[in-house]
Amino acid sequence: MRNRGVHRCIISVGSSNAAHVRRCAVSCCTLASANLARRDLTSSSAAHSNSGTFRDGRFDPYNAIIADITSSSTSSPSGAATKGRLKGWTAAIKSNICIRDHPTTCSSAMLQHFKPTFDASAVSLLRQAGTDIRYITNCDEFGMGSNNIHSVHGPVRNPASPRSESGPIWNLEEERVAGGSSGGSAAVVKAGLVRFALGSDTGGSVRLPAAYCGIVGLKPSYGLVSRWGLVSYADSLDTVGVLAKTVEDVSVVHSVLSQNDPHDPTSASQQARAAAATTVETLISALPSSNSSQPLKGLRVGVPKEYFPVELHPRVLPPFRRAVAGLEELGAQVVQITLPSTPSALSAYYIISSAEASSNLARYDGVEYGFHTPSAPGHHAYAATRTTAFGDEVRKRILLGTFALTADAYDNYFLQASRVRAQVQEDFASALRIRNASTKDDKLTARDQEGVDVILHPSAVDTAPTLAAAMQPGEPSAAEYVQDVLTVPASLAGLPALAVPAGAASDDGWPVGVTLVSQWGCDEVLLHVGKHLQTQLGT
């Protein structure tokens, strides 16, 4: 018998906390806009044109590819092409992940000529496994955005059109965004140009594009996949994620990437990895065989009531209900849970991530490397360089973060956001009955039968926005920020999250996704559940 509380929750769209969510997002936007106005910054139309790309002359109807490196001699190390778990697998890499001797621009004019002299650890592992790396993909500038429209190369178009099998609609009123910030990586996977792609996920930048494009996207547990060679946006939140058409493919790639890395000080220790592996093995071994008619019997899945704010469009609900029904048919017990700090998570995320970005991006001064404006004298060159080379969204977040760290604002903004983050982490720990292998504090772990193993929620509040709506002049950032409202809590908690396609919306035909979340280090649990769910849904 289905849990009535869960079904009441997903039938009734809206909650008493939704207004709070909206106010939080608006406050971030208003604060940043006010700072921009006071500083009278102007964007450079030449540096941030929506028509300019450099794609080595290759026609790319989705504007997803920055560079084609298929013929590169550095595609894979000697011998890797003939062996390895990923032999013959084609891949694309987001342009904020370093690839030796190839442009790593972060889709920014600031790094338009930057070519690293080393591979990111994730890229090195892919090469060693025999991967054929073909493309560098477009993204929101420095990973900041939810629509992949904040790019020096222009917006990425969504290949998942239900009305055209041959390419983009070429109509801004109908054409949709691919999601951000890893929209280019999602687009090349959806278009069938590569088997999988790497993206980065700070607050939803892999999961949101996966949902909008109708593919699978994994944000790993923080620290499981090395960040060495990933251009920093927000160090305490950044992760390297995987996008592919199937959970099975994501699982294989993740197993290659999930390695301890001495280059990365935030890389999870071998001890924590071993403890997590033991937990995963215990949980999965307690489930029936995959050949069973109910392979998830005994699994408890929680649906948080706070994940249905008024911003959630009703067309998202039918595919979500099908996912709930699918899990129940697979034997899982689905129950309603509460994550009470969710309404405050969005504003906390934007304050914390912007504060970290303001520090990380201070290094781009036009002196040591990066874009430089020679016309301005002395210290004015610093301001002129950053004003010209950074896009509007990046400048806005730098200013918001800088303000939040000032002596006058620190207590009211950054400190409060950090407290909210701790509350979000406690909420997840209380809801999940699996021990957190990254901490020795068992007080934050639910040990009784009321806890759940996995959490399920809609991936996004709606299907992909149209390009016309997303790029409308004067469109407030709050509308874009709210797209992250369902993805940022798992990021603040450092937990793994897997976006799985759940089918198409009945009215507009565009993809809808659902997301599975579990305890830190339980990525394999999500992948195990996700494989069965994707098969059950036929997506």
Swiss-Prot record:
Q: List the molecular function annotations (GO) for this entry.
A: ATP binding; glutaminyl-tRNA synthase (glutamine-hydrolyzing) activity
Q: Which Pfam families match?
A: Amidase
Catalysis: reaction(s): L-glutamyl-tRNA(Gln) + L-glutamine + ATP + H2O = L-glutaminyl-tRNA(Gln) + L-glutamate + ADP + phosphate + H(+)
Per UniProt, subcellular location reads as: Mitochondrion
* UniProt KW keywords: ATP-binding, Ligase, Mitochondrion, Nucleotide-binding, Protein biosynthesis
What class does this enzyme belong to in the EC scheme?
ligase
Claim: Amino-acid biosynthesis is one of the keywords in the record: no
InterPro entries associated with the record: Amidase, Amidase_dom, AS_sf, GatA
Q: Could you name the active-site residues? A: K94, S181, S205
Q: Provide GO CC annotations from the record.
A: glutamyl-tRNA(Gln) amidotransferase complex; mitochondrion
Quaternary structure annotation from Swiss-Prot or TrEMBL? Subunit of the heterotrimeric GatCAB amidotransferase (AdT) complex, composed of A, B and C subunits.
* UniProt family annotation: Belongs to the amidase family. GatA subfamily.
Q: What is this protein called?
A: Glutamyl-tRNA(Gln) amidotransferase subunit A, mitochondrial
